[in-house]
Design a protein with these regions (language model features):
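N-terminal regions that are enriched for targeting/export leaders
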Residues: 1-9
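FAD-binding subdomain of flavoenzyme oxidoreductases
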Residues: 112-134
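Glycine-rich N-terminal segment of FAD-binding domains in flavoprotein oxidoreductases
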Residues: 8-106, 116-121
């Protein structure tokens, strides 16, 4: 058991967690019984939406690798645990910027997608999910 927090640092909950190291790994679902599974990024949600009190957290922070970046088109493929701050370090020197940025750069890509975050330009650019392609 490990303690996980949301950004508000309340509630503090000890949770069973499984760290994901490879995006193609299969989760040991048979070990979880009837408990629910919830992916966990960097814990920057204001509420407790990133906590799973009676379930299992799937810690995606180790999934922090880039898959591909095309500096011509600006298209980036990466894993769920990559922080927006790391993306900015990669894309800004190439003349790109994220179309939507929430109030903190310490959000993971997976968290930004799961919560469909928005920035101050929401009325023009929409949410993070508007710029995600499969």
């Amino acid at each position: 058991m490990k303690e996980y927090l949301s950004w508000g640092r309340y509630p503090r909950q000890s949770q069973q967690a499984v760290e994901m190291y490879w995006r193609h790994s299969k989760l040991p679902l048979e070990d979880f019984g009837d408990r629910t599974c919830l992916p966990y990024g960097n814990g920057r949600s204001y509420g407790d939406s990133c906590l799973n009190s009676d379930g299992v957290l799937i810690d995606t922070r180790p999934l922090d690798r880039y898959i591909d970046f095309n500096p011509e088109s600006g298209v980036l493929r990466c894993e769920a645990g990559v922080l927006l701050s790391d993306i900015l370090r990669l894309v800004v020197p190439n003349g790109w910027f994220l179309p939507v940025t929430p109030g903190t750069r310490f959000v993971t890509v997976g968290g930004a997608i799961a919560n469909d975050v928005h920035g101050k330009n929401h009325h023009r650019a929409g949410t993070f999910g508007c710029h995600v392609h499969r």
